[in-house]
């Protein structure tokens, strides 16, 4: 069966592809790919907005994404302000 998979090619699962991409982004950031800050944060905020807006009516300013670095520790903070359910 492995020979058949080798000849026909085996498609990677979406989750494993996403995991590999995230690992590449994180590795590049740790090495210091850009001195100012992570360039993926605006894209991450935009994608979070797209996903959350499928379920809840929110404004683009209701999502805040922040990355903080302290010595050998990185903290990714995501704040999402959800609308009051009583309205």
Swiss-Prot record:
GO terms for biological process: cell division; regulation of division septum assembly. The keyword Cell division applies. InterPro entries: MinE, MinE_sf. The keyword Cell cycle applies. Keywords: Cell cycle, Cell division. Prevents the cell division inhibition by proteins MinC and MinD at internal division sites while permitting inhibition at polar sites. This ensures cell division at the proper site by restricting the formation of a division septum at the midpoint of the long axis of the cell. Belongs to the MinE family. HAMAP family: MinE. This is Cell division topological specificity factor. It comes from Delftia acidovorans (strain DSM 14801 / SPH-1). The gene is minE.
